[in-house]
């Protein structure tokens, strides 16, 4: 997912070694590092915003990753052991790149990140150059993986073959949302309020409109705003109301969404609201009356109220450790680590291999026809050489102040 300027991209903290270990640092920078350097462990790095406006996303991915790392290392007969280090990028692209360089100096061999889009796009340029395997839990822009055509059919960013996503791409969120609204007959007249200054929001909107047209789903009005005009949504809501919209699609983040819900309540306007992954987090937004989010729907790959054993165990561990209910970002991050672990086992890579060799073998493994993964955010997950994940989204609705599965 992208945050404002396209969430989803992790950044890594820079650790500068003392002069006595410069030679070892140079080996790591070249993709080296021996088994003795790593103590038999693969070095996994994580980057995200752990402070600042997007911290809710970064901390969720950090927590989910940590739980997975702890589980892997606790396996008595496990052949894979992991060393894990996080870095705060404050949702800033430049800081994210600096974080990556620092983690690289630490000896990072695989990157699980970054969390938000703009920083992730910046970091992928570095990992692609270094041929380091990168799996992001939540950076959803197609610019993260590259090789995707834009709305005009032009490919402006070449495919970065080392980068993969656990989350849905922005276009896929738009397509899936239109299909879900149509199939479930959630609304007959749809209004869209989107952020015209945000690639994340625009990308979802374009695909939503295209799919809605194919399905015969009526979009009666499209109301844009920008980051500079995101404090009052009276105009947009009045336009939706005048157009007779009985459902408003919100391909935006939870901060502006909270203002839209508050203003709609003031106006006495009560359409259904349907969001995307950026909406996840609205229930923990400080100062927001969560009763206003009652009935809000969104698509997500994860439901904390699911009854399968894996989800119940994860939710229980997360609540005990972090005193909070995990969201999809935490679940996606957990799955990232477990996918990496499974790919390491299947590929036969070892911690003493060079970064580039590890990357090539993991790419070949994760894209092979016989590689599938069952996790918190889906079963039978696969990855193609485009870097995109194939898995089914779940419909969620906010009920009594909690996310509840609509498909249970």
Task: State the predicted function of each range.
Residues 2-15, 31-408:
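Extracytosolic ligand-binding ectodomains
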Residues 19-24:
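Bacterial N-terminal signal peptides
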């Amino acid at each position: 997912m992208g945050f404002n300027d396209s969430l989803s991209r992790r950044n890594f903290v820079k650790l500068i070694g003392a002069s006595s270990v410069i030679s070892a640092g140079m080996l790591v920078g070249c993709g080296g590092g021996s088994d003795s350097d790593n103590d038999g462990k693969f070095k996994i790095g994580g980057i995200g915003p752990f402070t600042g406006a997007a911290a809710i996303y970064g901390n969720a991915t950090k927590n989910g990753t940590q739980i997975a790392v702890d589980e892997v290392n606790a396996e008595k007969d496990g052949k894979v052991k992991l060393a894990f280090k996080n870095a705060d990028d404050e949702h800033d692209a430049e800081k994210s790149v600096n974080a990556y360089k620092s983690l690289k100096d630490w000896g990072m061999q695989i990157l699980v990140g970054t969390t938000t889009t703009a920083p992730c796009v910046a970091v992928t340029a570095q990992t692609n150059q270094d041929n380091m395997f990168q799996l992001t839990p939540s950076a959803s822009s197609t610019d993260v993986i590259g090789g995707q055509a834009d709305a005009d059919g032009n490919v402006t960013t070449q495919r970065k073959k080392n980068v993969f996503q656990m989350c849905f791409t922005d276009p896929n969120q738009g397509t899936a949302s239109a299909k879900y609204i149509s199939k479930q007959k959630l609304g007959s007249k749809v209004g869209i309020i989107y952020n015209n200054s945000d690639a994340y929001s625009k990308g979802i909107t374009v695909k939503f409109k295209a799919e809605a047209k194919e399905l015969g789903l009526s979009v009666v009005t499209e109301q844009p705003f920008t980051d500079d005009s995101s404090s009052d949504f009276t105009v947009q809501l009045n336009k939706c109301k005048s157009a007779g919209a009985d459902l408003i699609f919100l391909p935006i983040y939870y901060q502006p969404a909270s203002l839209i819900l508050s203003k709609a309540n003031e106006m006495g306007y009560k359409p259904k609201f349907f969001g995307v992954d950026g909406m996840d987090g609205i229930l923990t937004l400080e100062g927001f009356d969560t009763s206003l989010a009652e009935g809000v729907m969104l698509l997500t790959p994860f439901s904390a109220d699911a009854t399968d054993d894996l989800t119940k165990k994860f939710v229980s561990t997360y609540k005990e450790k972090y005193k909070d209910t995990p969201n999809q970002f935490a679940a996606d991050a957990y799955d990232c680590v477990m996918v990496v672990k499974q790919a390491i086992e299947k590929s036969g890579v070892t911690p003493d291999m060079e970064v580039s060799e590890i990357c090539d073998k993991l790419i070949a493994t994760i894209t092979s026809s016989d590689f599938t993964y069952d996790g918190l955010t889906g079963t039978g997950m696969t990855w193609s050489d485009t870097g995109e994940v194939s898995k089914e989204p779940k419909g969620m609705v906010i009920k009594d102040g909690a996310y509840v599965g609509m498909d249970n």
